[in-house]
Amino acid sequence: MIPGEIITPDGEIELNAGRNTVKLSVANAGDRPIQVGSHFHFYEVNHGLIFDRELALGMRLDIPAGTAVRFEPGDEKEVTLVPLVGSREVYGFNGRVNGEINAEGRGG
């Protein structure tokens, strides 16, 4: 074994298996590209992105950690979101929640 080595079982690993997901159509109405990282609270992304924000409360992109989705000006694409897990407390980002998100997705 090499220090830091991760040994995984054979086969494919399914990310976020069994978690509820939401699909949203997202459009970039701005004049510059907008990139959103894998663990950014999607509800709080740049307001140049147009979508149903209430559905995104407490959610993040369903993509591998460390990756991102880029929206070019005028782009519209469908994204899949998964719930934030753990304590379901959201602090920072754009400061729109700064607290707990309850089971219904509403700020606490």
Swiss-Prot record:
SUPFAM superfamilies: Urease, beta-subunit. One of its GO terms (molecular function) is urease activity. It is an enzyme of class 3 (hydrolase). It comes from the Bacteria. InterPro entries: Urease_beta-like, Urease_betasu_sf, Urease_subunit. GO terms for biological process: urea catabolic process. Its EC number is 3.5.1.5. One of its GO terms (cellular component) is urease complex. It catalyses: urea + 2 H2O + H(+) = hydrogencarbonate + 2 NH4(+). Keywords: Cytoplasm, Hydrolase. The keyword Repressor does not apply. It is found in: Cytoplasm. The keyword Membrane does not apply. Pathway: Nitrogen metabolism; urea degradation; CO(2) and NH(3) from urea (urease route): step 1/1. Belongs to the urease beta subunit family. Heterotrimer of UreA (gamma), UreB (beta) and UreC (alpha) subunits. Three heterotrimers associate to form the active enzyme. NCBIfam families: PRK13203.1 (NF009682), urease_beta (TIGR00192). This is Urease subunit beta. It comes from Trichormus variabilis (strain ATCC 29413 / PCC 7937) (Anabaena variabilis).
